[in-house]
A protein has these predicted regions:
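Active-site-adjacent substrate/metal-binding segments within catalytic domains
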Residues: 1-9, 15-16, 70, 74-86, ...
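Ser/Thr- and Asn-enriched, surface-exposed coil loops between beta-strands
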Residues: 20, 93-97, 130-134
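Surface beta-strand/loop "capping" patches
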Residues: 74-106
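Outer-membrane beta-barrel proteins
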Residues: 55, 89-91, 143-147
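A short, structural micro-pattern
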Residues: 20, 60-63, 153, 169, ...
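Accessory beta-strand-rich segments of carbohydrate-active enzymes
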Residues: 1-80, 106, 118, 239-242, ...
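Extended acidic/polar, glycine-enriched regions
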Residues: 32-36, 102-184
Length: 259
């Protein structure tokens, strides 16, 4: 919603979000009734003090990405944590995996994490008592590396809130094992190999659509950029749709992501 949006449920204001690119959520529960609920979003892209103030591209207005209604049990991974999944996977070193979890209303529950390879085989598990911020460490032996366009291999982390044998909520996050660094003399290195970067910059708009592009449009952009022979994409100049980041992970593009 670009770029100032106010959300109402049954006429009750839930909040105002400023900024047109990042995911945001509101809890509808206090304003809902048994039936006949009405969700209203007012959006303006008028001149304001919201970043960016000006740029060499058009600031389209309105609702231009997905709007989702998410229903969860009382115990769930925190949907109000800055629009995230509240499950974060960090491969600190190749094979050494930290998973940070942020549940709510999960006192007395267990957090169960299962890591799976691309074929769905379990490669590691861990459990911990639920807390506002919990984490587990899992060591995956000899992981299959995410290796850019040559081999964009992805694992998944399946995090669950379990209470009395019942799974109350579950979130799956995909990730890859890789190491990288940039050298001022030799450029970009991925998994110990020098990889020359050839790329393009990408905006999120289309003729006659503005920013309201479809998943098929995202997929076509990926295919066209790949056809050019590029292996790198600079996402100008804001957060893009999460779907596009996921496509890049799947395809093997190195991303320059601007915030």
């Amino acid at each position: 919603a670009n770029h100032v949006a106010t959300v109402y449920c049954n006429g009750r204001e839930l909040g105002t979000h400023k900024g047109g690119f990042s995911t945001f959520r509101y809890d509808l529960t206090p304003a809902m009734k048994e039936s006949g609920n009405v969700l209203t979003v007012t959006v303006t892209n008028g001149v304001s003090d919201i970043y960016p103030q000006n740029a060499d591209f058009t600031f389209y207005g309105g609702l231009y990405r997905d709007v989702n209604f998410i229903e969860v049990k009382d115990a769930h991974f925190d949907l109000l944590l800055d629009g995230t999944d509240a499950v974060f996977v960090t491969p600190h070193n190749v094979g050494k995996t930290r998973v940070d979890l942020f549940p709510v209303n999960a006192e007395g529950c267990t957090l169960h994490v299962e890591l799976k390879d691309a074929e769905g085989n379990c490669v590691g598990t861990a459990d911990t008592d639920a807390a506002a911020h919990s984490h587990v460490l899992i060591d995956v032996k000899n992981p299959h590396l995410w290796n850019g366009m040559e081999d964009p291999y992805l694992y998944s982390a399946e995090a669950s809130i379990v209470c009395d044998g019942e799974v109350l909520d579950q979130v799956t996050v995909r990730y890859g094992y890789r190491s990288f660094h940039v050298c001022p003399n030799t450029g970009f290195w991925l998994n110990g190999k020098n990889v020359p970067l050839h790329g393009v910059a990408r905006h999120q708009d289309r003729l006659d659509k503005g920013w309201a592009i479809s998943k098929a449009d995202h997929e076509e952009d990926i295919a066209l950029i790949k056809e050019l022979g590029a292996n790198t994409i600079r996402l100008a100049h804001y957060q893009h749709d999460q779907y596009f980041y996921d496509l890049c992970d799947e395809t093997g593009f190195v991303l320059w992501a601007e915030i």
